[in-house]
Amino acid sequence: MQTIAPLWLWATFGVIVLASLFIDFVVLRKQGSQDIGVKEALNWSLVWIALSFLFNGLFWWAIKDTTGSTELANTKSLEFLTGYLIEKSLAVDNIFVFLLIFTYFAVPSHFQKRVLMIGIIGAIVLRTVMILVGGWLLAEFHWILYLFGAFLVLTGLKMWWAAGKEPNLDDNPALKLLRKLIPVSKDYDGENFWTMENGKKVATPLFMVICLIALTDVIFAVDSIPAIFAITNDPFIVLTSNVFAILGLRAMYFLLASVASKFHLLNYGLAVILIFIGTKMCLIDVYKIPVHFSLGVV
């Protein structure tokens, strides 16, 4: 796997992510059981977006300083921005699935914050592994791009056909399997994932929520990661754009949860994006669609 990013930029990225997670954890502890209002969620969302743009500025400077090419720095910076916006767009659909899960299990809002925090950490670890493996596969087997492209087109078509239909968690095969394998209590026991019931250790509904959130992220990662590989093969750009989009997921959830009903055309828009990106991947050896055009579509 080849990357244009210097080693010190990788290290800087790691420090920023760890510091961001620490700050988010401190804020979570300070808030306690207090609900997050729309204004606070908006402020934090703007903070995470600003941090992403600042990092992109640092990335642009690092490439220009390393290569001496302003044109190359502009191109790579644009690739980061496009990947970031793709991930942000797909994260909106992810958030609405989270909302569906929280509503189904009647999860109190102050419990939701902890679940989302765990979900963000899990998503960063999972996506780091998937991106590094995906980058290696693409470097060794170029034809995998065509598989990714076809998969995204099919996913986009499926999303278009399913748009407007209300999902039913009662019919979810993963939830049915979990309930068969793991005994679950009827009530919550604070923020505990396990509790004692009739002398036996059983899972709480919060544990089921964590499992479904993790499964949801796996499913969405399979969509979003190939989509960004359509923009660039550089694992650094794919990873950083993904992670910076994920860091603001908790604030973004509380910002959008209150206006979820207004996004009734969202899935149609996301379907178009996935179909376009999948087509771009399938045509990559025939015609290379410019990055700025991809950014415009997103």
Q: Whereabouts are the PLM-identified features?
A:
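Multi-pass alpha-helical transmembrane bundle typical of ion/small-solute transporters
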Residues: 1-298
